Amino acid sequence: MNKKTLKEEKYEHITHPFPPLYDADSKILILGSLPSVKSREQMFFYGHPQNRFWKVISAVLQEETPTTIEEKRKMLLAHHVALWDTIYSCDIIGSSDSSIKNVVPTDLRTVVEQSKIQHIYCNGRTSGKYFEKYQQKTLGMTAEVLPSTSPANAAWNF
């Protein structure tokens, strides 16, 4: 069975299917671009088994790598870390960031206003690009762009 090329696959309009993870005590906001196909199936962030996010954040927080969604939520909120994405809806082929078009950005103001966000980090260049284009000026905050934990980022290993 041959893998289809992006040109052979069809665009799908995706609207972000689940809410941000944060609470009133969140101080750090980590932004992805848009949930992958696997994340949309699981209805939670960084659901692809080869995505390195949970291993990396666990190492940074000096915690065991969580396996369930509830463990992931508890770990992040205990460390005042919020998760959300820069894209609310777009047209995309599968999980390919390079195919993204017709972007509607996420309104990040509610998360920032209802929490104590002091630092914003973008998980990868795509997230950083859309944050800078649509959200940086509105929020009056800058973000640091980190290497993507996506399995598509073969140049980076953890």
Regions flagged by a language model, labelled:
Residues 156-158:
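Post-His helix in hydrolase/transferase enzymes
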Residues 136-142:
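A short alpha->loop->secondary-structure connector
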Residues 130-136:
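Short Gly/Thr/Asp-enriched flexible loops that form oxyanion-binding sites at enzyme active sites
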Residues 2-119, 125-130, 143-154:
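A polyanion-binding, active-site-adjacent surface
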